[in-house]
Amino acid sequence: MAGVDLIAVTGATGGLGGRVARRLAERGMSQRLVVRDLGRAPELAGAEAAAASYDDPERLRRAFQGARTLLMVSASEDPDRLRLHANVVEAATDAGVERVVYTSFFGAAPECTFTFGRDHWHTEELIKGSGLAWTMLRDNLYLDFLPLMVGADGVIRGPAGDWRMAGVTRDDIADVAVAVLPEGGRHVGRTYDMTGPEAVTMAEAAEQLSRFAGRTISYHAETLEEAYASRAHYGAPAWEVAGWVTTYAAIANGDLEAVSGDVAALAGHPPMRLAEFLRRNPESYRQLRGSAPASPPDTAPAEGAT
């Protein structure tokens, strides 16, 4: 693929990276799919695959060689995530990549309420200091994962109070990514907020889920203490439980309620509302139709570089 503007896509077998890769292929863009397992790489027109993980800087460097732009999908939540992200940034710099588009988190800050959001801020700073041109896509909570927050008893439990969150779908984020990846220019040095067109409370989300799943889904507002206690029996490490709980705490703090027009402006269409997402994606709440979730509430398939 020498002589073309090659885009390297990490996480190409994951929920977000895979969506981006398919859209790039539909547009006839040349891309390199960076995956851990070549056997899982999708076969797409105009795409080649390279095996590399975020824990292997040398393979990353080889995988990025010849790419002009990199889509850096954030790694799975991990206490060592910053080191993994540093590997990606260093490898991209060494390989001669010119620009990185990074999937960050809405309201990322060094002391933001949502503990996993802090890694995103530090990663943004790492990218900005690398000499690479950059574009940040700060994603609000994924509407795709709301059904996974429902317990086996049909209750969403968390300390979100009556505050709102402007969740967004991965399809809409992918549409934005495909719009900004081929274009440097006006997107360089820009941070875009990825939200839906509305901000809903968890109680309102439960009502929508009830309507589509055909059973009663409710929301119970916990205190912070109750939230940590109700998750203690899962046996998850403390940092992971803190991430689950502070997802709701960030909502209660008003951190996730602002609605942005960036998706509509960049994707060329309005982002999906929750009801529209549920109507289009019945498989997202199939587990709510009588069978218990396979994993603890609050958990969701990680977006990382799979």
Residue ranges of predicted features:
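A hydrophobic C-terminal alpha-helical subdomain
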Residues: 225-306
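Conserved SAM-binding strand-loop segment of SAM-dependent methyltransferases
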Residues: 48-51
